[in-house]
Structure formats: C-alpha cells, structure tokens
C-alpha cells in the first residue's frame, strides 16, 4: 500500500477506500488504578482482554470494517515515570495487533488525548508531566484548575454535568500544559525541567515514548499509519486578552479567563462568569 496524489493505492494501483472505526473509548482509562495510584495503573486489557479478542474482531470483520483507528495513550505507555515504559502493556498490544492483522484488518495507531490528562479532566499524558512543573495533581480540582469526574463531588453539588469536560481546555491545568508543550520557549523561556526548557523537555519525552512504542510494534504488519496527537490544543497561545475567555470549545458553567485561572490556581478566590 502506498500514496499517490494524496490517495491510498494497493499493489495493483487501485484506490483504497477504508471502512473504519475507533477502538476504543475504554483505552483512554486504565483497567485498574485511580488518580492517586498513577504509578501502578495498568492498561492491559484495553480495549478488551485477549481472551475476548477473537469474538470482537470477528464481529468487526463480519460487519465489513477494514480499518481500525487504534487508541493508545502516553500514560498507558509511560505512567510510572520518565523513561519507564510498561513493557507488559506493549507485549499485550503486539498480541492484539497481531490478531487484528490475522483478520485482514489494517490499523492506524492513534496517540490519544483529551484536555491533556486524566488529572486535568480528560486523558492522555502521565501525571508526572504536571508534577515536573510543580503542580499538585491531587489539588487541581480544589482550586478550579480542573474538573475531573472522579473528584467532582468533593467540591461541587450534584453529579458531573454532561459535556462539561471540554471546558477544562480553558482551566489552568490543561491550558498551562499545552502552552508550555507548544510554546514554552517563546512564552516561558525561564521555566525549566531538570535544567532544560519545559517545551523541549516535554516534547522530547513524548517523542521518545512514541519512538519506543514504534520500535516495539514495528513488526506488526497490520499497522499502515501512525498519528501524532489527537486534537492538540493551543492552551493560552493566541489569546489576545487573558482577562477574557478565548480558545474555548464549549462554555458551560463557571468559566475563568486566563488570568482568573492563574489566580485561582494559586489558591486565591476569584469570581468567574457562568455560562
């Protein structure tokens, strides 16, 4: 399979049109382990246990699917600490991807994230990425720097509102991490991690993790492509006025502007507009 004029071609030069699906939503969260036990979580069994794989994959084949957008996360690969890769999880991935290939289904690997991490209201990056920048991952909800489903009831009345999770893109936790990941050298050049600029350090860790994953999975013949990052966000980058609300996907409930988010994250009370 190859590409000509932005079109996928098979060995005979015919256009290839895939029928695909995501696999799967459960892969964003560990099988076991909560927000506090992040070093020892396990993603083995996501998207499903090996013993159930045959039934699920045969069903997808019968339904006519020829491509799977296979979800992995940075946290699943490197949750224990920088450079500490979960080889057991990678071995599990190799087995699952081999079974997918045996069904004649192709795979596009999708390094997934929503609002940076589970500690900032979504999924994706490991907790240590925040801790390396001095954030207390157990206190982000308390100061409004994140709204997580796991800790919402501790600080708010009622249940976790539907579709409020995208508002985390504008809260301090996720907005700061994305700003530093993509623009730290420009906007915060004196912010360092282990003596290196925050942007360079974070990007090097992320890319090193993806390279390691690629090396472990490169013999899986079902893989035809590899994504970079699902739905990256600019954080505060591009905002014209940090007093207001910009770069937002959804405005629901109390929504702080950039400066308000920074003040609240420092432990001070602020009044935020409610949408």
What kind of feature is each model-predicted range?
Residues 1-67, 98, 102, 106, ...:
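N-terminal carbohydrate-binding accessory modules
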Residues 55-60, 89-96, 209, 213:
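A general structural detector for well-ordered alpha-helical segments in enzyme core domains, enriched
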Residues 65-90:
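Aromatic-lined carbohydrate-binding/catalytic grooves of carbohydrate-active enzymes
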